Amino acid sequence: MMQCVVRAGVALALAAGQIAMAQEEDADIRSAIEAERQLLSEQTRRLEEQLAEYEAQQKRLDELESRLSDDRIPEVEKTRDEADSGVAPERLETGDNETRDSHEVMTAGDLAADDFVGSWPMFGSNYRMKIGGYVKLDALYDFDGTGDKTQFLIAQIPVDGSAAAQRDGYFNMFARETRFNFDVRQSSDGGPEKQLFLEMDFFDESSFSPRLRHAYAVYGNLLFGQTWTTIADLASLPFTIDFGAGDALFGTRTAQVRWQQDWNETWSWAVGLEDLQYVGIYNPNSLPGEATTKLPVLAGRVTKQTSKGRASLAALVQELRWDGQGLGPNASATGWALIYAGRRNFKGGDFWTWNIAYGDGTPETIMALTGSNANAVLEADGSLTTRKGYSVALGYGHRWSDRLMSNFAYAFTDLENLGLGQRAPDAIESGGVGHANLVWQQGKFSAGVELMWGQRDNADGRSGDATRIQAMLKYGF
């Protein structure tokens, strides 16, 4: 009897153990099932986000395709018709390849309104990214031995009687204008629009290393970093194959902080504090010290833009200073400039452009005079005398067909003559460059040929002229 009881107890214990093990296995299975459910739920959520992003992108593509419908009339033709239809003004749209640098700085509302075609979502965030740029091959023949073998610059035109004037013509082929950029933007989340933009090319004078062109951030209407100066209006420049683009132009890229805002659909304004890259003081008497500045450049611009064109009025004020460093004189002066620029569209796709600038103590901002100490003269008595200068750049674009167009441009600059000894004898005092080209374009691919002629006058009265022909193959992406 006792043995039976023991056996029954053992059996019950074994059964209880088996039940406990089964319960533990059941709990593990339930835990695994719950983990799989959570993983599946997370994957479903991500798929739904990607699907929503895909649908939004498809909607943007559909909107773009609808713009291009209308019996497949090219977009440039639509813009052309709207410009002459008398409809309410809209923002000016320019086709690819119409300006040498098509990148336009946008803030706030303009960023929100931009379609950002070609971008893709950065999954896990509300940012989108786009990679752009172009590959460009240039081949040129210079008839007069111009100093720069990659761009046609007034300062590099040989003058009569110089050793450079004895140089023969030459051929050159290069791809240094090739560039690439990264554009990152944040989709609207109820806050300010945001953008990061970085662009490089290979136009470094001493090597083929990448060279920084643009590096800036936008937060709403605030921009900070390096890009075109606030006073620059790229729409006022016709397309040229030559990278120099007729360097009697006012404005360059510089470090800055800028506020840029639309008043309405037609008017916008911008104001910025910028780095003064070249103080530009000529020291003919070799007085001790150096050119410097204690203040940033103050620049501003007002722009009117419609479907028929655009016009902008800009101004800048800057300080010029000579620091005697305890050994020479201390002196300061103020420089200023006014710039009127714009573009006017005509029926048939033609347009004309203008960029007119005049200033006192600011000629170094004219590209042809940059680095030539053209802003002011340090007199023997230690005072600063500012120098006046102006530049005029005019252009006309004519469209022969949807794929073929020509551009004609002339840019001229002149610097005030302050008298004998007030400028280095071999420095530029005036000069100009003309361009005429024929460009064929299909989609992102373009090819063209350009003839250019330039003339230079030095402070010592010597002058020279040069001629160059240049061809290109270019593919944008």
Regions found by a protein language model. Give the residues of each.
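Surface-exposed extracellular loop regions of Gram-negative outer-membrane beta-barrel proteins
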Residues: A175-F197, G300-Q325, M405-A409, V439-Q442, ...
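Outer membrane beta-barrel
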Residues: V117-V279, K294-L295, A299-S307, R343-K347, ...
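N-terminal periplasmic/intermembrane-space "pro-region" immediately following the signal or transit peptide
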Residues: A22-D148
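Detector for outer-membrane/organellar transmembrane beta-barrel domains
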Residues: T303-R423, I428
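Outer-membrane beta-barrel "beta-signal"
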Residues: W440-Q442, D465-F477
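Sequence/structural signature of outer-membrane beta-barrel proteins
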Residues: D142, S187, D201-S207, I231-D233, ...
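N-terminal signal peptide c-region/cleavage motif recognized by signal peptidases
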Residues: G17-I19
